[in-house]
Amino acid sequence: MGFADLWYSHPRKYGQGSRFCRACSNNHGMIRKYGLNICRQCFREYAKDIGFRKLD
């Protein structure tokens, strides 16, 4: 049993550890609204492609 098996052996079905960014697999700074499930860094990169636009 290696270190990774011990460290991540607990099942992650709910909570912050269960959600990952669909673009980069990061789990920090998640935007879950509207079912985006994307981290804030990737959102800034892909927002225009998704259809969001900045309002002045």
Curated annotation (Swiss-Prot):
Matching Pfam families: Ribosomal_S14
Record localization: Cytoplasm, Cytosol; Cytoplasm; Rough endoplasmic reticulum
Keyword Ribosomal protein on entry: yes
GO molecular function, one term: zinc ion binding
Keywords: Cytoplasm, Endoplasmic reticulum, Metal-binding, Ribonucleoprotein, Ribosomal protein, Zinc
GO BP: cytoplasmic translation
InterPro entries referenced in this protein's UniProt entry, alphabetically: Ribosomal_uS14, Ribosomal_uS14_CS, RIbosomal_uS14_euk_arc, Ribosomal_uS14_sf
Cofactor stoichiometry and binding remark: Binds 1 zinc ion per subunit.
Transmembrane residue ranges: none
Cofactor: Zn(2+)
GO cellular component: cytosolic small ribosomal subunit; ribosome; rough endoplasmic reticulum
Main localisation: cytoplasm
Keyword Magnesium in annotation: no
Binding site for Zn(2+): 21, 24, 39, 42
Family per similarity comment: Belongs to the universal ribosomal protein uS14 family.
Assembly and interaction partners: Component of the 40S small ribosomal subunit.
Name the record gives this protein: Small ribosomal subunit protein uS14
